Regions:
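Alpha-helical scaffold segments that flank or form the walls of functional sites
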Residues: 86-155
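Flexible loop residues that form catalytic
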Residues: 15-16, 78, 137
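Gly/Ser/Thr-rich helix-start
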Residues: 47, 72, 129
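N-terminal metal-binding scaffold of metallo-dependent hydrolase/deaminase domains
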Residues: 1-54
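Hydrophobic faces of well-ordered beta-strands that scaffold small-molecule active sites
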Residues: 71-75, 132-134, 157-161
Length: 161
């Protein structure tokens, strides 16, 4: 038997690219929508009442005043800089030399790379980002740590060594 969870609330979904056609044709907002999740994956997005009738055994969570939308995509990120978020520098070179380069060298330790990768991905998921494209460090295991952390969380990533 599959594990089913039904999220009820206003839904936002896309059937096309709103930059290539009228947004009314590409974007659908359903104020009485639902998202059926089966075994941790989105199975169906549609009318909440219809989904509830079709899946009476599903665990239901209501988001009355919330908008349920697709996961966000971050197309350019440097996960190794997670620990120095909001560090200040007068000029870019000062910031790089004072914070970035020393922090990225710390990821030469595989355990630390794993810790930072996990911390970064937990932050992204907590804020609705489900897909990322990240730079890693010059250390090959920094990419391995990110891929492993993403696999552990079921998150999609693009990164490289």
């Amino acid at each position: 038997m599959t594990n089913q969870r039904l999220l009820l609330g206003a839904t936002l979904s896309y059937s096309g690219n709103p930059m290539q056609s009228a947004w009314e044709d590409a974007v659908k907002i359903d104020t009485e929508g639902g998202v059926m999740i089966e075994d941790g994956r989105i199975a169906v997005v549609g009318n909440g009442d219809a989904l509830r009738a079709a899946h009476p055994q599903a665990e239901v969570t209501r988001y009355a005043d919330a908008l349920i939308c697709p996961g966000f995509v971050d197309a350019h990120v440097h996960y190794p800089q997670t620990a120095i978020i909001a560090s200040w520098g007068k000029r870019l070179i000062d910031w790089l030399n004072t914070y970035t380069f020393p922090e990225e060298m710390r990821l030469s330790d595989p355990a630390y790379a794993g810790e930072i990768a996990g911390r970064y991905l937990d932050l992204t998921l907590a804020h609705g980002t489900t897909t990322i494209a990240s730079y890693c460090t010059i250390h090959p295991h920094s990419a391995d740590a990110l891929f492993q952390a993403a696999e552990d969380r079921g998150q999609r990533i693009v990164a490289g060594k």
